[in-house]
Amino acid sequence: MAYGILFLRVVVGLLFFGHGAQKLFGWFGGHGPRATAGFLGQLGFRREHALPMALMAGLSEAAGLLFAFGFLTSLAALGMASVMVVAVATVHWRNGLWSTDGGYEFNLVLWAVAIAVTASGPGRFSLDALLGWVDNASGVWWGVGVLVVSLAGGALVMRLREPQLPAEDTDAALTREQERETQTIVS
């Protein structure tokens, strides 16, 4: 089992790290913090919160490196799980479960991995085990804690968004904006 958890931690952790590095540094084909902030603004997050949120999302995902090494594993898992909650709520939920439709299937799997590794512990091939921290920072209640805090943290982050118009109001607002642009061009 120790080898299985090691493999899971390393693969998922390095993928999370890469995704965070895209946001923080623009590495691996990413766009960096300013473009990520712009994307968050398009998702409805207030302008003054967008850049700090982009940096926090990048740091939380960069925690994948800690997860891969099994160092401060429960804390790293909390950051990773929280980012997945926000990703589902802002981007994927409206598309349904399946990722073929842009849904949250993959995000749910990553969230579950973070919680499961926290509940089961990072395994004997981890820095936490080397330091003797496994029994103090993992277990069922730690997993439950990551589950609850990631959901609560995600809910708090969602409160930083601007109120969203219902879809029909959004369509009407876009139509009015297009009419104004057309009138301006014609004038």
Question: Can you say where each PLM-predicted feature lies in the sequence?
Answer:
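Cytosolic, membrane-interface loops and tails of multi-pass inner-membrane proteins
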Residues: 30-46
